[in-house]
Amino acid sequence: MNLWKDYLPEFEGYILEAKYARLGGRGFTDSQRDAFAIAERIAVRLALAERVLISTPMWNFGIPYKLKQWIDVITQPGLTFRFDPAQGYLPLLKDRPTVVILASGSDFVTGMNRGRIDMATPYLREALRFIGISDVRFVPIGPTTGPAEPIRAAHESAHRRLTEIAASF
């Protein structure tokens, strides 16, 4: 799915109402049902995938809003997680190999990030784990800006790692 080109509903209005209706054990109105059906189609696409590849930049230490929007749309009760009063939140998706390629202007691998914090990696790890995907390998690429030599070295390192991962992906 290309999050910049494919349709993603805004997570508001009827789709938001549908989420909380389902969490509260209430039925949907017609408008809520229609809105939830869109989220369901997107979540089913993920549920049926044998493997997942997420390629994203790091923006302001986090993820782009479109990736966050996709996570909000697919993280729905009864589709990708459920709630049990005795056990809490439980994932509904089966685990599958997942690779996250994360490009950043800074170097978060060797510590040359000048004290900045990578908030994208822990967020994505937890968001995916919450719905059942824990076999996640992160491939950081950075720096992507600045002097040519560190950029070249980062690209080569990421390429080597991706070649290794591809053999079993």
Question: Where are the model-predicted features located?
Answer:
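Residue-level signal for short, function-critical loop segments
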Residues: 58, 104, 142
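Short, well-ordered alpha-helix to beta-strand connector turns
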Residues: 49-50, 95, 133
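Amphipathic coiled-coil/heptad-repeat helices and related helical stalk/stem segments
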Residues: 38-39, 85, 120, 158
